[in-house]
Swiss-Prot record:
Catalyzes the transfer of a ribosyl phosphate group from 5-phosphoribose 1-diphosphate to orotate, leading to the formation of orotidine monophosphate (OMP). Homodimer. Pfam families: Pribosyltran (PF00156). The gene is URA5. The keyword Glycosyltransferase applies. It comes from the Eukaryota. Pathway: Pyrimidine metabolism; UMP biosynthesis via de novo pathway; UMP from orotate: step 1/2. It comes from Metarhizium anisopliae (Entomophthora anisopliae). This is Orotate phosphoribosyltransferase. Gene3D superfamilies: 3.40.50.2020. The keyword S-adenosyl-L-methionine does not apply. Keywords: Glycosyltransferase, Pyrimidine biosynthesis, Transferase. Orotate binds at residues 38-39, 140, 168. GO terms for cellular component: cytoplasm.
Length: 234
């Protein structure tokens, strides 16, 4: 794969393709756009793939600490896909950097508040007064991340940033349905709205750079055309 990508990005991309997480073809998205590729993080359910995604997340987080000043106390995974992610990533961070990250905790939310036992919406470490790093698979419209940020703030936590597996670098659908208009991405809007850093293991640019060593010319061409048509302004 492309030497332009960091080794952990190459390894993650390879695992995603071999595991059927990243597929090429023709896929209708919620936006009704027809995408030449599809990323389904729900397929990271085997031991090998769970290890691959948690390792890639951990290395992305450590890279952001070293190069972008990211600082956090707790890994937060929004229900549902974020739940296994936050626990696996926390374990992996402690394994990779025990001298610096073995005290990192994790938390996740419930879709519905529990009214017995310990009660509440949050499971895991208390968020109050802590710097919280949200982890999830992708950001589509940003609605779920806004809900997570709201929950964290209500619990007294401070949102330090967000890390996702994939940044499609794709503009949001236009309100009037005219996709020829320029526009921002969901990630760009969240950065602007909340003033928080958002990082990704892979971007669409990374996928295109990497796929040149394994994909067909037709898949590469269609993916590049899709990027050109729907690329965000941010």
């Amino acid at each position: 794969m492309s030497g332009q990508l960091a080794s952990y990005k190459q390894e993650f991309l390879k695992a995603a393709i071999e595991g059927g997480v990243l597929k090429f073809g023709s896929f209708e998205l919620k936006s009704k756009r027809i995408s030449p590729y599809f990323f389904n993080a729900g397929e990271f359910h085997t031991a090998h793939l769970a290890g691959a995604i948690s390792s890639a997340f951990a290395k992305t987080i450590i890279d952001a600490q070293q190069n972008a000043g990211l600082d956090f106390d707790i890994i937060f995974g929004p229900a549902y896909k974020g739940i296994p992610l936050c626990s696996a990533i926390t374990i992996k961070l402690g394994e990779i950097s025990p001298q610096n990250l073995d005290t990192v905790s994790y938390s996740f939310d419930r879709k519905e508040a529990k009214d017995h036992g310990e009660g509440g919406n949050i499971v895991g470490a208390s968020l109050k007064g802590k710097k919280i790093l949200i982890v999830d698979d992708v950001i589509t419209a940003g609605t779920a991340k806004r809900e997570a940020i709201d929950k964290i703030r209500k619990e007294g936590g401070i949102v330090a940033g967000i890390v996702v597996a994939l940044d499609r670098k794709e503009k949001l659908p236009a309100a009037d349905g005219d996709d020829s208009k320029p526009g921002p991405s969901a990630i760009g809007e969240l950065r602007k709205e909340y003033g928080i850093p958002i990082f990704a293991i892979l971007t669409l640019d990374d996928i295109i750079a990497g796929m040149k060593s394994f994909a067909s010319d037709d898949d590469i061409k269609r993916t590049e055309e899709y990027r050109q048509k729907y690329k965000a302004t941010d």
